[in-house]
């Protein structure tokens, strides 16, 4: 789910506050806009896999394992070291494919809030410059990638070892602050 809102701040000429401010004060404090974008996702679904030899005898390597129980841990039992119950998945026996479905496991959610403060400074009729301050991941909330899903890796399956590293809109890494100025004529 994504939310997007644009708020014109109530300062400066024609606004609720400082509507009669002198020209220079109005030019500096009036006309600012705040843009807020929020991305929220409860789960990132993923599939368990195995990388053993070819049990189905179809010249393939790995695939979906057999699912012997749910595999999703209650949210209170999930940790970065044990996100899902790996004992619920086993490599299929010789002669057939695994019975696990695709995307049957719930990964970590996503909560990212981005804000932009912007203002256009009109210098004359043909010349102005724009100022923008962007803050990605305002609350610095960690957004984890899906855990390792290969049940053939001893001690590795179910472990979350990474976050979304770089800022890219809805896949924000740590908080990022950026300022831009653009002159238009």
Write out the residue ranges for each language-model feature.
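Short, solvent-exposed micro-motifs at the edges of structured domains
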Residues: 1-185
